[in-house]
Curated annotation (Swiss-Prot):
Mn(2+) 1 binds at residues 71-72. The lineage of its organism: Eukaryota, Metazoa, Chordata, Craniata, Vertebrata. It comes from Xenopus laevis. Residues 1-27 form a transit peptide. Its EC number is 3.1.3.16. Residues 28-292 form the PPM-type phosphatase domain. InterPro entries: PPM-type-like_dom_sf, PPM-type_phosphatase-like_dom, PPTC7. Binds 2 magnesium or manganese ions per subunit. This is Protein phosphatase PTC7 homolog. Mn(2+) 2 binds at residues 71, 216.
């Protein structure tokens, strides 16, 4: 079987310390990215940090590390619209705003709002829809600020246990909250949520905490216990080890997505709605795997 996997990483200078907190130290995220496009079996892969209709970004600023994932809604393809354009442009805009310092670390919803507003104001309409999940680490306060709209999301793992996670937002089965831009004649007929509808949260993190941010292609195919099993293999806190683990998670999710006999989380969710579904859920998969580390300039 021929498949294509793309992996990337953000090389940040960081020194890993113990698990004890020291207020005088700044923190950073050391992040690796891996993913599959749904059509990866055909050997088709987009350039950059885009996997099928998924997109992601990793950005650094002197005050914070910021990362995000977005999942373009594939249904737009039926109307001749490339779903990846919306998610990719949304993430690139978020990335640019962060690098330009046009954001407040405590307000990731603000980043999403500003980026979405720019898309709305484009002279050439950019049609489409997307979920979005943003994670911001404030270096000095050691607090993680998050915003999640839809069914992408994040996990924070400490000592092998999930200590924080995002809440999935669905209007109804398999219909997540989403940002949308519709043609004028279809406004009001296309499902669209406000960035303010995103579920936001803030909490302290510790050195060595693992943060996994991903699109639903991961969570629909791998339950928490499988993800935690893979994270246990992360023995070394160097970039190569983080990237290898991110790759292993993405590969396993991709394999399970095409297993017709596997009772996936998505299939279990469908059964809760009275649907007779079995097997994995073929989808684009994007995984950002981060470790909280001590920051050195």
């Amino acid at each position: 079987m021929f498949s294509v996997l793309s992996c990337g990483r953000l090389v940040a200078r960081a020194v890993f310390g113990g698990l004890s907190q020291t207020d005088s130290r700044d923190y950073s995220l050391v992040t690796a990215s891996c993913g599959f496009g749904k059509d990866a079996r055909k050997g088709i892969l987009k350039k950059g940090m885009c996997y099928g209709d998924d997109a992601c970004f990793i950005a650094r600023h002197r005050t914070a590390d910021v990362l995000g994932v977005a999942d373009g809604v594939g249904g737009w393809r039926d109307y001749g619209v490339d779903p990846s354009q919306f998610s990719e442009t949304l993430m690139r805009t978020c990335e640019r705003l962060v690098k330009e310092g046009r954001f407040v670390p405590t307000n990731p919803v603000g980043i999403l709002t500003s980026s979405y507003r720019e898309l709305l104001q484009n002279k050439v309409p950019l049609l489409g829809s997307s979920t979005a999940c943003l994670v911001v680490l404030d270096r000095t306060s050691h607090r993680l600020h998050t915003a999640n709209l839809g069914d992408s999301g994040f996990l924070v793992v400490r000592a092998g246990e999930v200590v924080h996670r995002s809440d999935e937002q669905q209007h109804y089965f398999n219909t997540p909250f989403q940002l949308s831009i519709a043609p004028p004649e279809a406004e009001g007929a296309v499902l669209s949520d406000s960035p303010d509808a995103a579920d936001s949260n803030s909490f302290d993190v510790q050195l060595g905490d693992i943060i996994l941010t991903a699109t639903d292609g991961l969570f629909d195919n791998m339950p928490d216990y499988m993800i935690l099993q893979e994270l246990k293999k992360l023995k070394n806190t160097n970039y190569e080890s983080i990237q290898q683990t991110a790759r292993s998670i993405a590969e396993q999710a991709h394999d399970l997505a095409y297993d017709p006999n596997y009772m996936s989380p998505f299939a279990q969710f469908a059964c809760d709605y009275g649907l007779n579904v079995r097997g994995g859920k073929p989808d684009d998969i994007t995984v950002l795997l981060s470790i909280v580390a001590e920051y050195t300039d």
